[in-house]
Amino acid sequence: MTCGLVRIRLARFGRKNSPVYNIVVANSRKARDAKPIEVLGTYVPVPSPVTKRELKRGVVPIKDVKLDFDRTKYWIGVGAQPSETVTKLLRKAGILNDAWATSKNSNVNRKVVFERMETLE
């Protein structure tokens, strides 16, 4: 899979030990926190705290993700390549299907293909 010039990736903001990420469209050659082309949403990986009473009731702490679906679909349609972490988020959001290839998956698939070719020979 070739990497395009435009990527959808995470840009870190927030304080020390309290990360907040912006989901941004940026030039792949720019620094992580450089000015992006467009901000698509936010991702807070630390779950919001719940009280003991809520824990007893079975309330599960959740991670906050806010995303502009229309703009994200537009950028993917134009050819922007999401990073691996953003790909996972977009799969959970239902924007990408499970067949979407990442560089990590394609390397694993190549190894499996080569192993099968060796066993067939």
Curated annotation (Swiss-Prot):
The keyword Mitochondrion applies. GO terms for cellular component: mitochondrial inner membrane; mitochondrial small ribosomal subunit; mitochondrion. Keywords: Mitochondrion, Ribonucleoprotein, Ribosomal protein. Coiled coil: none annotated. InterPro entries: Ribosomal_bS16, Ribosomal_bS16_CS, Ribosomal_bS16_dom_sf. It is found in: Mitochondrion. Its main location: mitochondrion. GO terms for biological process: mitochondrial translation. One of its GO terms (molecular function) is structural constituent of ribosome. The keyword rRNA processing does not apply. Component of the mitochondrial ribosome (mitoribosome), a dedicated translation machinery responsible for the synthesis of mitochondrial genome-encoded proteins, including at least some of the essential transmembrane subunits of the mitochondrial respiratory chain. The mitoribosomes are attached to the mitochondrial inner membrane and translation products are cotranslationally integrated into the membrane. Component of the mitochondrial small ribosomal subunit (mt-SSU). Mature yeast 74S mitochondrial ribosomes consist of a small (37S) and a large (54S) subunit. The 37S small subunit contains a 15S ribosomal RNA (15S mt-rRNA) and 34 different proteins. The 54S large subunit contains a 21S rRNA (21S mt-rRNA) and 46 different proteins. Belongs to the bacterial ribosomal protein bS16 family. This is Small ribosomal subunit protein bS16m. It comes from Saccharomyces cerevisiae (strain ATCC 204508 / S288c) (Baker's yeast). The gene is MRPS16.
